[in-house]
Amino acid sequence: MLNPIVRKFQYGQHTVTLETGMMARQATAAVMVSMDDTAVFVTVVGAKKAKPGQDFFPLTINYQERTYAAGRIPGGFFRREGRPSEGETLIARLIDRPLRPLFPEGFVNEVQVIATVVSVNPQVNPDIVAMIGASAALSLSGIPFNGPIGAARVGYINDQYVLNPTQDELKSSKLDLVVAGTESAVLMVESEAELLSEDQMLGAVVFGHEQQQVVIQNINDLVKEAGKPRWDWQPEAANEALNARVKALAESRLSDAYRITDKQERYSQIDAIKADVIAALQAEQAEGDALDENELGDILHAIEKNVVRSRVLAGEPRIDGREKDMIRGLDVRTGVLPRTHGSALFTRGETQALVTATLGTERDAQNIDELMGERTDRFLFHYNFPPYSVGETGMVGSPKRREIGHGRLAKRGVLAVMPAADRFPYTVRVVSEITESNGSSSMASVCGASLALMDAGVPIKAAVAGIAMGLVKEGENFVVLSDILGDEDHLGDMDFKVAGSREGITALQMDIKIEGITKEIMQVALNQAKGARLHILGVMEQAINAPRGDISQFAPRIHTIKISPDKIKDVIGKGGSVIRALTEETGTTIEIEDDGTVKIAATDGEKAKHAIRRIEEITAEIEVGRIYNGKVTRIVDFGAFVAIGGGKEGLVHISQIADKRVEKVTDYLQMGQEVPVKVLEVDRQGRVRLSIKEATEQTQEAAAPAAPEAE
């Protein structure tokens, strides 16, 4: 019989329910988590044994949204869900990041977490619900896992922190921050902000971590009631003899190698050392004994980590010779590509980004159909990380999870300074091509995007820059590193990325690999990051200190006019015939909004003027008594239809063609013939009565010479 176990608790303004034991009983663990009608079903399956030769931890997080959750049927030919959307990929990464550090070192059994959104309240985002569910399912499973974690979203509305704000509340919030952590430590932060201070951001992190303790407590209580026995797993005992031998062979040489400042040269030397160590050990092996290269790789990595970390903690120069708070050399160039609307090449040490900005019309905006509803995105940010950027070969194709995640982070860094649509009615696409990478290419993308946008003439509110910080901590001793290299990222305890302007922070991302990161350490890191950010902004401002006064000659110029909403149908025409003909005739792009706003986009100013003139003709009111030049469009037995200004058509009755009786209309008029017509009447239905006879008489009278005056 089914025996569900349920826990309910209040979490901010929402009620959260955790339920297990009802579904998916063949999975290692399963839990249904709901928060005010948004429900996510999360399962965990773990392999009891690791695959032979497995040298990494194969954790897979799948997050999937089902359209039935919102009472909808999927679009597309097959009418079913397909590959993960960008949003699903980003939430999968959000779940993964705080969970991965909590699995013990040496645990390489395959683990898969699947989170399926099965019901959605449009006001409650499923991401926090899915994170809570993944934490609960792993805690229930008995798999070696040092959790649970809690997760919270924090908003900042009217100078107050708000726990798990609704979607409507987020629209007026200056902050959208997600924080996850254990009972004692923050592990992950992801956020975007509207130029908030370091203290405000840190306060939000602390607030979110404090509030999520209720989640951790309730998961612990659920585990006591329904948890499976903890797996009897122990890490393999270290091979002390091999450790000592490898250390003797490699430590001093690796220490010297990590003084080589050039990345490629350093890597070549490290590869040579590893090859020499393998050769030496193989020569010492007894015949028939095989060398475990995975184990050897782990030992060498531990030695490298110790070499770099001990040097930093001792106050010695870093791998490339810098002090802890030094930024690598900067090279900033704008306008590097002649035909793009805006471009920049941003180089920081061995990290380089070629960034472009392209302006388009509203038609170029991305329509996104999400579970939470449809929305239109006018600012697109795409990040590409080709294999040549790190001197490797590899597959080139659709973006991978990492590229999607880095692109979103860089976009968050710039979003707060983008102009409003009513001030700058363009769709903007930024593309960052990473041409070299050795640490923090996403933050180089933020800097490059700011430069390219200003080069394109986009009136951003302020220049923004980004910086990646690192941390090395042993006991109470810690050092915060500015502008970390790739090696410092891998061998350190924290990856901490901050983007912002001189005024405040626009994006903060934090991934912490250890416990014990205190508020004071985060404060030091944020303040040090501010100094680095201001330094980079100073160098950027020497290249370009304000948006260009005009957009590129190759960019479409958008001209806006207003027409009466009643006239929209006239400009569009039957089945779009009029607007289609207008765009072809003028070579422009024309978009009409429901309030009568008309936007004409053209790269040629004369074409735009022509389009505006034609629209004004079409929407002009017809004046009774006025004479127009018209063109015969149809001939019928009882008269002829004549098109006058603005594509409007009126009827010339057979009695109004000439000043004598007309038996046959075609005796007087031909298709396409241009004739003067006078407007006799416009009835309530908008039908127009015209007269050629009166127009001709009036024209002749005006042209006749005046009679001589009597003497």
Curated annotation (Swiss-Prot):
EC numbers on record: 2.7.7.8
Protein keywords: Cytoplasm, Magnesium, Metal-binding, Nucleotidyltransferase, RNA-binding, Transferase
Residues holding Mg(2+): 489, 495
Enzyme class: transferase
Pfam families: KH_1, PNPase, RNase_PH, RNase_PH_C, S1
Glycosyltransferase in keyword set: no
Cofactor requirement: Mg(2+)
Cellular localization per UniProt: Cytoplasm
Molecular function terms, GO-annotated: 3'-5'-RNA exonuclease activity; magnesium ion binding; polyribonucleotide nucleotidyltransferase activity; RNA binding
Entry superkingdom: Bacteria
Domain annotation S1 motif: ranges: 625-693
GO biological process, one term: mRNA catabolic process
Function: Involved in mRNA degradation. Catalyzes the phosphorolysis of single-stranded polyribonucleotides processively in the 3'- to 5'-direction.
Family stated for the protein in its record: Belongs to the polyribonucleotide nucleotidyltransferase family.
HAMAP family the record matches: PNPase
Name of the protein in question: Polyribonucleotide nucleotidyltransferase
Native source organism of the sequence: Cronobacter sakazakii (strain ATCC BAA-894) (Enterobacter sakazakii)
The gene coding this protein: pnp
